């Protein structure tokens, strides 16, 4: 059985790029769950899917600065309790931040891409799904805008 949710939410976030500095991004999120029907003959209650998965995504990456933890340009240090120092040192940009921990999502990757954010979300969400769910697919995509836009 497959349950597909198109446009579950929109991730509005920023990330650090060694060439462009701080870059804003918006991704539409689609989710596909596969598995066996439960005792109520449902894969997963549709209302719960939307609420639970959207809340995880919103809490973890929406309206945050996404940090590429494994990038050679990134240095993350604990500051005072609840605060973090971030230094991002590239040939083109030097960025120094001192912010509350909740301002960031630390992505275990060398760069921020839809694929690395998807892998991060798969890890977070997979642990929160009921036992009858055996497959999870997440797609991050840009909204098609037929008029000129800047990215």
Give residue spans per PLM region.
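Charge-rich, low-complexity N-terminal segments
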Residues: 1-151
